[in-house]
Amino acid sequence: DYEVRTGEEAVAPGETLTFNVTKYAVSDSSITNPAEMPEVTVDDAEYVAGNTANITVNLPSYSKVGVYTYEIKENKGQSAGVTYDATPIYLTVLVTRDEATNALKVTQYGFKKGVAGDKVDVGSGAAFTNSYVTGDLEIKKQVTGNMGDTTDKYFEFTVTLTGEDGKTYAGSYAITGGSYAENPESIVFNGTTGTATIYLKHGDTVTVQDLPDGMNYQVVEDDYSGEQYTTTVNGESGRDSGTITSDFASELTVTGEKATVSFVNDKTDENIDTGVYLDNLPYIIVFAGVLAAVAVLVIRRRRVD
């Protein structure tokens, strides 16, 4: 079984689950060494995304009465974002002799989670529960300042996803939101990396959905300092070191929570030279009005003469 954490829309990836069986203990039998116990096998389980995988345990033929206990462990898989159940289950098989036929038979069997754990109802409960953890990457854009373009200008971003070595990933991750019509609908993931270019303007938010736990991401905005924009990322200077790199980037790791990267581009100019001093503007306007009035009077007098 799979427990999915974070987004309600997230679906655990399909994979083949494998198991390891160990002869654990034997009692009430002429067999005293567990290594001499008959072998139990567990078939591989095909887990289909969004469903529950059924596990088939194959019991052997027994030649001795006794109580046989086997340890069954799930082998750790490679699906990104999945935490595999490390607690084994213990199968106990009771073999008795039929007094009427003298034949051996399996009288009872049962499962426990852990050595001293609770009984597992294989008919309705899950013997193994794996956790699939995802998080969304949210990218926001704001433009501030008296000269900032808050209506039409789109800013270019490059989003790069990098996976962990040895892990398997989905072929793509959906991109939603934003107002730019040509933004891609997903980031195509090729092996361990994927890159997409998106455009955001003031007030836009784009979300890359259901990134598996442990996925690294980098969000880089183009350099707009030539247009007199000053960039900050999550409140820090776009040129600081650390998680914010010198190329206006935010680099972090998905940890099963929504990660928000907020880019703010500020363009402020307090010294705009228009050739007019605002402190004198009312007087200049009044003076221009006086000149206009004089001109009208002069023209009228000439016409009368």
Kindly give the residue locations of the regions a language model identified.
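Solvent-exposed loop/turn and edge beta-strand elements of beta-rich ligand-binding domains
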Residues: 1-305
